[in-house]
UniProtKB/Swiss-Prot annotation:
Pfam families: Ribosomal_S8. This is Small ribosomal subunit protein uS8. PANTHER family: 40S RIBOSOMAL PROTEIN S15A. The lineage of its organism: Bacteria, Pseudomonadati, Bacteroidota, Bacteroidia, Bacteroidales. It comes from Porphyromonas gingivalis (strain ATCC BAA-308 / W83). One of its GO terms (cellular component) is ribosome.
Amino acid sequence: MTDPIADYLTRLRNAIMAGHRVVSVPASNIKKEITKILFDKGYILNYKFEENDSQGIIKVALKYDLAHKVNAIKKLKRVSRPGLRKYVGYRDMPRVLNGLGIAIVSTPRGVMTDKEARELKVGGEVLCYVY
């Protein structure tokens, strides 16, 4: 697989469209960090890391509003990809939906949201947009 982050986002997107409550994805350090950000910002209900004999599995519980039949994540968009990396400085950090969404950025200080990167004045690679 050439782009594990795109695979992770696609698995989440497919589970949302199918109406699944829980989705299992192969674990990696960057996927764990992205999942933690999604949980902290309220886009997913819960997550659990399960150790197995190889790399482990992340089980993500998706968040839905059952009364209106909508989910918390409207769109997951991969920005920087292996064929075309997108790096930005903290001054040029993108604002997703004028601040209503988040951009997940990989910086020298770790994976964080666009707002945190602006506050710490650190740039990096824009991994994806979530709104």
